Amino acid sequence: MSRRNQAVGAYGERCALQHLITAGMRPVERNWRCPHGEIDIIAWDGPVLAICEVKTRRTDTFGAPAAAVTGPKARRLRVLAAQWLAETGTRADEVRFDVLSVRVTAAGPPRIEHLKGAF
């Protein structure tokens, strides 16, 4: 991944994090990593633990941002969530998997779509 794409992705994650906070969610972890992958954001939405995948795009050339979360990616996030829960000892009655699509434009603020329970 190019440095420019990394910068766009990092910017999108910061925007998504602020969006979640503004919506009243409580982030507990950001960019959690293990040998099997990474979870972008983990946050409480009331009693529900949300595992959030952030996808940022500058154009729709390669499709909508959320379309990048394919079956294999969803399965990997489920495994990562189980590992995070086990490692931290966190208990949650409900775990939800969300996708935040961030579209960055040259003019104006980014557009953020929060798909709760995306998979």
From Swiss-Prot:
Gene3D superfamilies assigned: 3.40.1350.10
Descriptive protein name: UPF0102 protein Sare_1228
UniProt GO MF annotations: nucleic acid binding
Protein family according to the UniProt entry: Belongs to the UPF0102 family.
InterPro entries: Restrct_endonuc-II-like, tRNA_endonuc-like_dom_sf, UPF0102_YraN-like
Matching Pfam families: UPF0102
